[in-house]
Amino acid sequence: MAEKLPRPTDAELEILTVLWSRGPTTVREVHDRICARKPTQYTTVLKTLQIMAEKGLVRRDEKQRAHIYQTARPREWTQRQLAGDLLQRAFNGSARSLLLGALSAQKASKEELSELHRLLEEYEKGTR
């Protein structure tokens, strides 16, 4: 059975997004990126990263004076886990309802719809 990490909070997901885009990063760099979008205290980012390390969401490298944080799992792994959790909790396991909900919540581009068609055909054929 696949390892299941705790579901990240909104604040943790925001930090994970920074780490996925930047790679291994210091608390200061994460704080600067988040502050570019909204005012946040440095100590809040630090404490959140410490909690995330305890939960297994990130790893901390303590070899340097400024600790370096990186995600414990790739973005795709976390997205799959979150999608599966949402599928069960909000859509009663119905992939159809999840997809329709996503498409009605935000308009998809023609390119995205073409890609979805292609992926669905691959799943139907069993090649994905």
Q: What residue spans do the PLM features occupy?
A:
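Short acidic, hydrophobic short linear motifs in intrinsically disordered regions
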Residues: 25-34
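Short beta-strand "wing" residues that participate in macromolecule-binding interfaces
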Residues: 59-60
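Short, cationic-aromatic polyanion-contact patches
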Residues: 5-11, 63-82
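Amphipathic alpha-helical dimerization/coiled-coil segments
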Residues: 81-126
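Glycine-centered, phosphate/nucleic-acid-interacting loop/turn motifs that mediate DNA/RNA or nucleotide
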Residues: 56
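Short capping segments at the starts of secondary-structure elements
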Residues: 18-26
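Short alpha-helical segments that sit at the start of domains
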Residues: 1-17, 126
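Short, hydrophobic-biased segments on the C-terminal half of alpha helices
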Residues: 46-50
